[in-house]
A protein has these predicted regions:
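Active-site loop/oxyanion-hole signature of alpha/beta-hydrolase fold enzymes
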Residues: 45, 87-127, 131, 289
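Conserved HGGG/HGGXW glycine-rich cap/lid loop of the alpha/beta-hydrolase fold
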Residues: 50-98
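Flexible "cap/lid" loop of the alpha/beta hydrolase fold
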Residues: 137-142, 148-178
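Conserved alpha/beta-hydrolase catalytic His-Asp/Glu region
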Residues: 161-163, 176-233
Length: 299
């Protein structure tokens, strides 16, 4: 007979049936704390993507922000891998994934190839922050049947023209004074002001940015999106969407959140108090609770 130490069965059920929404229940089997874990590289058109896969259950994919990588989601993977199959990736040009080549590519097609290669048959939940939001929204528009739900945190979208957030200044710095100088310049951007208030968060953030190659700052990026751009197609998104902003994030990302909420019929908008652009890292417990409630109850 299995004991509590070597076998546990956890069933998550919601009593209010009328609130059952995306994931009505999840059952997790754990054996001596063991969970499935694998990592590697998936070939994509003219490149390869690094991924880590943890846990078991309905699939969830995490999409990081610009100049960052899969490490920004560690506190989410640690939590959600208890209930879901967590696929955490480095988008092309970032982290351990290959740099762009001369051929055009798109994030959403890269994600499609990766999911197919991992034999992910059922629709996925895409959890994304900042630049990752572009990838998530484009994927949901290109492959609606493979999209279960979206979580868009301080997200960017194709077709939006920023007013307070200018990456060209960082590119100019990299080209004129070098990538290392540009990294220090970027770390002082207003989007990271709130993260600086937490030493451990900023240390992790700084580590990722200092390891960034700087490729996008020095080269013309052959990435392509959708036509027309996503901002003109938001009403076509039928999947449920959770929109999250950090209270202290800059105006542009607050504006994008309003645009998303006003144009996506099945969307819910939440704000995390005392958090900035990196809300999932600054307030991981609050972020995880909001996402978990959304996936279980749709709220």
């Amino acid at each position: 007979m299995a004991t509590r130490n070597n076998f546990s069965l956890i069933a998550l059920l919601t009593i209010r049936l009328r609130h059952l929404f995306i994931i009505p229940f999840a059952i997790l089997l754990t054996f001596n704390g063991w969970t499935q874990s694998r990592q590697g590289f998936i070939p994509v058109n003219d490149g390869q993507l690094y991924y880590e896969k943890n846990g078991s259950g309905p699939p969830v994919i995490f999409l990081h922000g610009i100049c960052l990588d899969h490490r920004m989601w560690q506190q989410q993977v640690d939590y959600f891998s208890k209930y879901y199959t967590c696929i955490n990736i480095d988008l092309r040009g970032f982290g351990k994934s290959s740099l762009p080549g001369p051929a055009t590519y798109s994030f959403h097609e890269d994600i499609k190839v990766l999911l197919d290669s991992l034999h992910t048959a059922e629709p996925v939940v895409l959890i994304a922050l900042s630049m990752g939001g572009k990838a998530a929204v484009n994927f949901s528009l290109a492959y609606p049947k493979q999209t279960k739900a979206l979580v868009l945190a301080d997200a960017a979208i194709d077709g939006y023209h920023f007013k307070d957030f200018n990456l060209e200044l960082v590119s100019n710095m990299a080209q004129q004074k070098g990538v290392d100088s540009a990294k220090q310049f970027f770390l002082n951007y207003s989007i990271f002001a709130s993260a600086k208030n937490d030493t451990s968060v900023f240390k992790r953030l700084r580590k990722m940015i200092l390891s960034y190659s700087g490729w996008q700052w020095l080269h013309k990026n052959p990435i392509v999106g959708l036509t027309p751009p996503a901002i003109e197609q938001l009403e076509q998104i039928k999947a449920p969407v959770l929109i999250i902003t950090g209270e202290k994030d800059i105006w542009d990302f607050q504006q994008i959140a309003d645009i998303l909420h006003n144009n996506i019929k099945q969307s819910v908008k939440k704000q995390i108090l005392d958090a900035g652009h990196m809300c999932n890292m600054e307030k991981p417990d609050v972020f995880n609770r909001l996402v978990s409630d959304f996936l279980i109850n749709g709220e």
